[in-house]
Amino acid sequence: MTKRALISVSDKTGVTTFAAGLVANGFEIISTGGTRTVLEEAGVPTLAIDDITGFPEMLDGRVKTLHPNIHGGLLAKRGNQAHQKALTEQGIHFIDLVVVNLYPFKETILKPAISEAEAIEMIDIGGPSMLRSAAKNYQDVTAVVDPSDYEQVLSEISSTGTSQLATRKRLAAKVFRHTAAYDALIADYLTTQVGETEPEKQTLTYERKQTLRYGENSHQQATFYQSVVPVSLSIASARQLHGKELSYNNIRDADAALRIASEFTEPTVVAVKHMNPCGIGTGKTILAAYRQAFEADPVSIFGGIVVLNRPVDQATAAEMHQIFLEIIIAPSFEEEALALLSQKKNLRLLTLDFHAQEKKAVELVSVMGGLLIQEQDTVVENDQAWQVVTERQPTPAERDALNFAWKAVKHVKSNAIVLANESQTVGIGAGQMNRIGSVKIAVDQAQAAGKLQGAVLASDAFFPMADSVEYAAQHGIQAIIQPGGSIKDQASIDLANHYGIAMIFTGTRHFKH
């Protein structure tokens, strides 16, 4: 009996060559609409779908392959006599291979000003149904959803007359992943349309971007997946211009640096090590900002990740070229700057769009047996609503420094303390189990660098005791910003008043675990 393949694709890549190869191996081709036109124009003979179903397309093409003559031919087991008898009685032929990719729903909803009605018309019904039928019957039927699989399938058919069972099983798994992701995207779109934020069942869709050499450590396997709906301001969307492939740790550190850089509109440079900033600097030019970030901690920046929110010019590149860095990310690189930095073969240089405005994003954290989902901490705070709780008001310069430090401290691992001036972090205490411990680390760092005088202090959460204020006062800190909210707030306020310290309560905590 002549073998049959049903081909109906929105992505026409390689389809004419593949179909011609099938015909050369004795297959009849059944096809629909635009795919059939493309194949016929390429000289590939086809049968129209309504020649098989005996029923015309209807409802503006919504119904064309949903028919027993199609799904019976896909689902019938070849070794089952009852199935064969049923097909014979109904005049249905086996269909041995299905090549389908789905309506471009994702591409449609990413277009600007797309109406809901337009999006709904791009929800494919017949395609997923055929793919699922073929994939369920992978013992006998080959289901192909990706043009990258054409070559292997055709090679096996040319060699043995059929695809290998292992290949069919692999492709079946690929089909179910594909249709599940497709349905998840539709569900997410409709969920967003109705404003639901906590659906009872959560489905997440990502595409493999890169197989990594290893994970956090060399004995751990790792893969980098990208959201099917791209996020422009993300390491996943960055374009790499030079250097080795990114590692697992590179990606996490770069993500942390990008999140910090996105807080600032003025020229800003962020240096990150192990998910924490080691230096943040702003300036009138990107060179001035880089110098501020470098001088914040010239030791820790070595081997770090640097993000600049302005194009890299030759002068800035020349200074970065003097030290060892893992990654530099910027909106762009001037030609001379790129040439200079590219002399370091292992230095990774990436660009991305810093002007992209994304909808509110969520972040995911896996726990044993579960998944935590929360909104990203991107709350926009109104500093005019902050409350000065002490007798002394901060000076304008202190206010600027407090604002800068507050933007920085939310990106430091809790318990987090940042000492800063108006344009530079000068001491960072991160990840300590008690807050006074982080205060001491930040003060020691600033003191060692000779930058403690005039620095202000930011704390990501309230002071549970007044000891942090006491220690800060003993080391000359004259302005503090914190969320407030402790049952012992008054003790901290009284101590600040005693030392003439200005203190602001923001009312917003920024824990980072």
Swiss-Prot record:
State the CDD domains in the record: IMPCH (cd01421)
GO biological process: one example? 'de novo' IMP biosynthetic process
Which PROSITE patterns does the record cross-reference, listed alphabetically?
A: MGS (PS51855)
Tell me the domain of life.
Bacteria
The MGS-like domain, residue ranges: 1-145
Q: In which pathway does it act?
A: Purine metabolism; IMP biosynthesis via de novo pathway; 5-formamido-1-(5-phospho-D-ribosyl)imidazole-4-carboxamide from 5-amino-1-(5-phospho-D-ribosyl)imidazole-4-carboxamide (10-formyl THF route): step 1/1; Purine metabolism; IMP biosynthesis via de novo pathway; IMP from 5-formamido-1-(5-phospho-D-ribosyl)imidazole-4-carboxamide: step 1/1
The catalysed reaction is: (6R)-10-formyltetrahydrofolate + 5-amino-1-(5-phospho-beta-D-ribosyl)imidazole-4-carboxamide = 5-formamido-1-(5-phospho-D-ribosyl)imidazole-4-carboxamide + (6S)-5,6,7,8-tetrahydrofolate; IMP + H2O = 5-formamido-1-(5-phospho-D-ribosyl)imidazole-4-carboxamide
Name a single GO cellular component. Answer: cytosol
Q: Which UniProt keywords apply?
A: Hydrolase, Multifunctional enzyme, Purine biosynthesis, Transferase
Recorded GO molecular functions are: IMP cyclohydrolase activity; phosphoribosylaminoimidazolecarboxamide formyltransferase activity
Enzyme Commission code(s) on record: 2.1.2.3, 3.5.4.10
Give the family per the record: Belongs to the PurH family.
**Per its UniProt record, what HAMAP family does this chain match?**
PurH
Domain note? The IMP cyclohydrolase activity resides in the N-terminal region.
* Protein name per UniProt: Bifunctional purine biosynthesis protein PurH
The species is Enterococcus faecalis (strain ATCC 700802 / V583)
